């Protein structure tokens, strides 16, 4: 064995090596010749030349051993010349004898313990190899280090490589192989990695310069006692098990899922989170790893708030403004402008504007009659009605009067239904019974048939077969809807609409160009004249019949016009004409001075949309516009008035029909009474007589027919009569017997 020790006398700048086989030692001086250093046996060395005079008791370097004390000259074990004869060991010498450099030189290789430990290097590679002979003789890279024992070489063949451990192989530039049989590989470029479908990238140190290996393909090692590495996006430190455990704990804990901070639930690794929407307002879609959230085209929400606006299932409410809820519409005392004309029909729910409301008021006033009218400011002056010579100022009161009269009529009808009959109204026939086959139809007379819905058939053999048709008279026929056949043998034909006619190249439109039915007073080859026709109204909208005197007046007017055409042509207003003589759609008025505008005076009120208006109409229009603006109400009022209009139209239309029908029937009844009262029979015994009579009351006429019989003894008298008025027939019978 060899050992290295420093004498306790002085730990100076020299070393002494004893291999354990010599009694003396191998020694050397230090650079400044302070003293020799060697084995020391405890005796103080004398001051002689070999101790350089520094071994005296007074010297600060006292107790430094002498050559003799280190073995003595007799043994020749510690002599300076030993270096010339020594072959089995390395000698360390200073420069006191001028035989060696000032540094330690170990030669090309160092072998310790008979070669079991060696140290070698290469001058060319500047590498170092420490270990067994196999390691020392193995290949080496530039500036590499190989440390290893055993029969298998530890090789650091890569430049700047390090191999430590038996058979360790560091074959790549800058690589490190640590441990038994560890081998290195080329470094791998790791830009990213995919774990469970998740791509991780942007790694620090993703492009390593070399590798450190602590094993091989089959031999693996654990690295223990690793300090915790820095954990950051730029860190390239190794991490230990505790750090990975913390990551594992965190990963295993997953993450928490809450909704509005409530209902917390854990989502762990491997769990699936399903995204869904129950109300359909969100449309969720997934493409690859992307989840898209979109609003549905039709949102379904319970309520919605936007600023001061609130919308829910009850409707829309604007704070301090309008609202539209299931309870109705509240305009919030604000005006609604630019409302287009809404449809005004039985089924319409459109909003209407002020102009429509004004027209409604005007229409209501017209239908109310009784001098009702609309003022310029839109207000309505109520009507006054006269029912049976009594005046009423309200519809309610008028209805009361009508109801009173209807009650009287109902009493009369009740008497008829009860078999009491009507005075002076009788019927006599031995023919087939009448048949009212249509819904709400009336049939009167022998073999009279009313088969159309709402039809009326009166007279022997009369036929009313179409909807709303009326056949009045013997064998009268009304096969066309809403048509009337008047008189015996009369027959209606298909309705023909006459839109207008052209006179002298000018086309004229006719009113009543959409007739709903026709009235026939005869048939082909059996025509009738209509006499006693009252003069009808003559206007652009009139549909009244005109009589002969009116046509005569027209003829006279035409003759007068023809006489004055020539003279009037000089002063007439004419159309401008094209160069070919055809008329233009313009007129140029010119008086005595062509430079002075012409004033049109006494201009009538325009009627149609293209008629000229006069100043009065213009002022009225402006006044109406202002009145409409003042009368404009909110949406609720409009709807209410719209409903009131429809209701009023319906009720007043029905009322008008009932009143007219009641008035006509009352007058007809009076006429029938007069006609029946005028019948006279022969009172002579055994006589059968026939009578005819007529009656007229307030524009309604009636005809009565009757048969009378007086017995031979004049005790028994009987009669049978029938009367007609306005297409309605009545029958009556009477019988008397004298007992004494």
Swiss-Prot record:
Q: Where is this region: Translocator domain?
A: 687-740
The family line of this record is: Belongs to the autotransporter-2 (AT-2) (TC 1.B.40) family.
Q: Does the keyword Protein transport apply?
A: yes
Q: Tell what the record comments on domains.
A: The signal peptide, cleaved at the inner membrane, guides the autotransporter protein to the periplasmic space. Then, insertion of the C-terminal translocator domain in the outer membrane forms a hydrophilic pore for the translocation of the passenger domain to the bacterial cell surface.
Positions of region (Surface exposed passenger domain): 12-647
Q: What InterPro entries does the entry give?
A: Adhesin_Head_dom, Coiled_stalk_dom, Pilin-like, Serralysin-like_metalloprot_C, YadA_C
Q: Which gene encodes it?
A: btaE
- Please provide an example of a Pfam family that matches this protein in its UniProt record: YadA_head
Q: Which GO terms describe its cellular component?
A: cell outer membrane; cell surface
Q: So which residues are the signal peptide here?
A: 1-11
Q: What does this protein do?
A: Binds to hyaluronic acid and epithelial cells, and is required for full virulence in the mouse model.
As for subcellular location, the record says: Cell surface; Cell outer membrane
Q: What is this protein called?
A: Autotransporter adhesin BtaE
**What biological processes does GO assign it?**
cell adhesion; protein transport
Q: Which keywords label this protein?
A: Cell adhesion, Cell outer membrane, Membrane, Protein transport, Signal, Transmembrane, Transmembrane beta strand, Transport, Virulence
Region entry Outer membrane translocation of the passenger domain, spans:
648-686
* UniProt note: phenotype after gene disruption: Deletion mutant exhibits a reduction in the adhesion to HeLa and A549 epithelial cells compared with the wild-type strain. Shows an attenuated phenotype in the mouse model.
């Amino acid at each position: 064995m060899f050992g290295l020790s420093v004498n306790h006398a002085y730990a100076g700048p020299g070393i002494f090596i004893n291999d354990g086989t010599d009694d003396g030692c191998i020694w050397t001086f230090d650079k400044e010749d302070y003293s020799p250093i060697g084995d020391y046996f405890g005796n103080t060395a004398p001051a002689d030349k070999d101790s350089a005079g520094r071994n005296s008791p007074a010297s600060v370097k006292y107790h430094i051993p002498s050559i003799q004390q280190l073995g003595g000259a007799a043994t020749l074990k510690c002599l300076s010349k030993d270096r010339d004869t020594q072959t089995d060991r390395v000698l360390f010498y200073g420069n006191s004898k001028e035989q060696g450099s000032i540094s330690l030189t170990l030669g090309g290789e160092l072998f310790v313990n008979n070669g079991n430990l060696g140290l070698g290097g290469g001058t060319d590679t500047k590498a170092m190899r420490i270990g067994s002979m196999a390691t020392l003789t193995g290949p080496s890279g530039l500036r590499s280090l190989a440390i290893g024992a055993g029969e298998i070489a530890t090789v650091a063949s890569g430049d700047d490589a390090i191999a430590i451990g038996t058979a360790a192989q560091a074959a790549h530039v800058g690589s490190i192989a640590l441990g038994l049989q560890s081998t290195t590989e080329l470094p791998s470029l790791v830009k990213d990695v995919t774990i469970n479908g998740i791509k991780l990238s942007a790694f620090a140190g993703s492009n390593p310069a070399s590798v450190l290996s602590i094993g091989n393909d089959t031999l693996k090692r654990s690295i223990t006692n690793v300090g915790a590495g820095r954990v950051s996006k730029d860190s390239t430190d190794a991490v230990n098990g505790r750090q990975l455990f913390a990551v594992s704990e965190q990963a295993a804990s997953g993450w928490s899922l809450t909704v509005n901070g409530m209902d917390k639930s854990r989502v762990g690794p491997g769990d699936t989170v399903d995204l869904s929407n129950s109300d359909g307002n969100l449309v969720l879609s997934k493409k690859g790893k992307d989840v898209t959230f979109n609003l549905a085209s039709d949102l379904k929400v319970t309520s919605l708030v936007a600023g001061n606006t609130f919308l829910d299932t009850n409707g829309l409410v604007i704070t301090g403004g309008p609202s539209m809820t299931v309870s109705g519409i509240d305009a919030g005392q604000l005006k609604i402008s630019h409302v287009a004309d809404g449809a005004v029909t039985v089924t319409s729910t459109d909003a209407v504007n002020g102009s429509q409301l004004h027209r409604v008021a005007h229409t209501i006033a017209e239908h109310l009659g009784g001098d009702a009218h609309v003022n310029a400011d839109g207000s309505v002056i109520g009507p006054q009605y006269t029912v049976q010579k009594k005046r009423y100022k309200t519809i309610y009161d008028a209805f009361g009067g009508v109801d009173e009269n209807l009650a009287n009529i109902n009493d009369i009808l009740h008497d008829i239904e009860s078999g009491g009959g009507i005075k002076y109204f009788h019927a006599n026939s031995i023919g087939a019974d009448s048949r009212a086959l249509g819904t709400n139809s009336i049939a009167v007379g022998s073999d009279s048939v009313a088969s159309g819905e709402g039809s009326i058939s009166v007279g022997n053999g009369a036929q009313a077969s179409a909807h709303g048709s009326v056949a009045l008279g013997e064998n009268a026929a009304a096969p066309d809807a809403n048509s009337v056949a008047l008189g015996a043998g009369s027959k209606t034909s298909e309705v023909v609409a006459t839109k207008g006619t052209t006179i002298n190249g000018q086309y004229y439109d006719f009113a009543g160009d959409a007739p709903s039915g026709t009235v026939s007073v005869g048939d082909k080859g059996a025509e009738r004249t209509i006499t006693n026709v009252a003069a009808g109204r003559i206007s652009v909208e009139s549909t009244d019949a005109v009589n002969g005197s009116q046509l005569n007046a027209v003829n006279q007017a035409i003759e007068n016009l023809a006489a004055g055409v020539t003279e009037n042509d000089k002063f007439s207003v004419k159309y401008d004409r094209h160069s070919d003589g055809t008329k233009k759609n313009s007129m140029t008025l010119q008086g005595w001075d062509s430079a002075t505008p012409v004033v049109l005076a006494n201009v009538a009120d325009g009627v149609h949309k293209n008629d000229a208006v006069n100043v009065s109409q213009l002022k009225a229009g402006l006044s109406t516009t202002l009145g409409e603006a003042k009368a404009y109400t909110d949406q609720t009022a409009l709807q209410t008035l719209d409903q009131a209009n429809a209701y009023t139209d319906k009720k007043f239309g029905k009322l008008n029909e009932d009143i007219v029908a009641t008035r006509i029937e009352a007058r007809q009844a009076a006429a029938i009474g007069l006609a029946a009262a005028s019948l006279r029979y022969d009172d002579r015994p055994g006589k059968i007589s026939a009578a005819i009579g007529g009656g007229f009351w307030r524009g309604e006429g009636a005809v009565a027919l009757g048969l009378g019989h007086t017995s031979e003894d004049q005790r028994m008298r009987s009669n049978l009569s029938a009367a007609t008025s306005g297409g309605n027939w009545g029958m009556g019978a009477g019988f008397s017997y004298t007992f004494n």
